[in-house]
């Protein structure tokens, strides 16, 4: 905490913490979600295991806050205080309809979490070591109630921005199919690496049909392209996390260097074309997930007869095309037109 903290360092630490916390909490569901559902149907006594995924998804705020504290080299008490405030403000835990208990509702609002985590971090930096002897009894309640309370109060406002953005995107649904799918794929490729939740936008505009399919393909293109671009400079686990978990792990990096989205946007546009040509479908509930948990491919296959041909088509459009176009555009912008460098994709996590 004695190091000089610049605005850039502060912003990057907060965004990196939110990004890493999001991915860590979503990866269990992405890898095991469908498997645990299947196990629960075969062995009802093990159905409770699916609850672990629901809880993990709801803990993004807590995990992100603690990770942000680690990035700032805070003490455990300070880090957990940020986590508690961020979890409370994010809205993933809400009262039951009869107000007698609590229930989990999704993963919470990422924008609200960023705001609250930044506020809580600034609060702890302001206090510094003044409360050192009483930190255990002062910091957690003050940060949770005051900072978390402010964050929770702003939750409806930040959630409303998602709806406003959704209303703007909704106008695209009246365009010609190929133009529609290209734009939707590119927009969702951007949304998934932004503080805005792509799933929330998809639900807000009730996106379905080929528009939903294009949204998922855009996210697939984003995940695979970022993994390919960072293959030489990041660990293999981090690369895989981009499409198995969420591309949001690169959110802070993209905010710092927006130009690294060039290959992603081009790859998403190509995938969007194939969404229209091959009639790739989806639903409002599936749009926004992409390849994570195989939600996108499974949602499309649910609209087909499930034949071997349809399975092959899904594999081509959800994996082969994003990977091939990702390789092409990464090489284009790093070798042929050297606008970006592989080092630009390095994540310091």
Tell me the role of every PLM-derived stretch.
Residues 1-349:
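Pore-lining transmembrane helices
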């Amino acid at each position: 905490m004695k190091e000089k903290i610049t605005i850039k360092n502060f912003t990057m630490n907060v965004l990196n913490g939110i990004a890493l916390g999001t991915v860590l909490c979503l990866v269990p569901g992405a890898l095991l979600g469908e498997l645990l559902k299947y196990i629960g149907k075969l062995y009802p006594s093990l159905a409770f295991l699916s609850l672990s995924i629901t809880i993990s998804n709801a803990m993004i705020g807590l995990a992100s806050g603690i990770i942000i504290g680690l990035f700032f080299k805070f003490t455990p008490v300070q880090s957990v205080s940020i986590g508690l405030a961020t979890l409370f403000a994010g809205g993933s835990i809400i009262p039951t309809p009869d107000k007698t208990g609590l229930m989990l509702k999704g993963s919470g609002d990422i924008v609200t979490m960023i705001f609250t985590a930044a506020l809580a971090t600034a609060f702890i930096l302001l206090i510094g070591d003044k409360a050192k002897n009483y930190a255990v009894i002062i910091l957690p309640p003050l940060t949770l109630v005051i900072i978390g309370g402010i964050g929770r109060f702003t939750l409806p406002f930040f959630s409303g921005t998602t709806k406003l953005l959704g209303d703007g995107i909704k106008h695209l649904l009246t365009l010609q199919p190929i133009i529609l799918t290209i734009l939707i794929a590119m927009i969702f490729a951007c949304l998934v690496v932004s503080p805005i939740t792509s799933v929330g936008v998809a639900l807000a505009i009730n996106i379905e049909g080929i528009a939903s399919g294009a949204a998922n393909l855009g996210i697939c293109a984003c995940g695979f392209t970022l993994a390919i671009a960072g293959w030489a400079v990041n660990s293999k686990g981090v690369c895989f996390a981009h499409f198995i978990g969420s591309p949001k792990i690169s959110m802070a990096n993209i905010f710092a260097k927006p130009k690294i989205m060039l290959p992603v946007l081009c790859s998403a546009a190509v995938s969007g074309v194939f969404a229209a040509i091959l009639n790739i479908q989806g639903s409002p509930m599936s749009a926004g997930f992409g390849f994570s948990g195989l939600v996108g491919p499974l949602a499309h296959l649910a609209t087909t007869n499930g034949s071997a041909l349809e399975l092959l088509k899904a594999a081509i459009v959800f994996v082969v095309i994003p990977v091939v176009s990702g390789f092409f555009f990464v090489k284009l912008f790093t070798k042929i037109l050297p606008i970006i460098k592989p080092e630009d994709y390095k994540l310091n996590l």
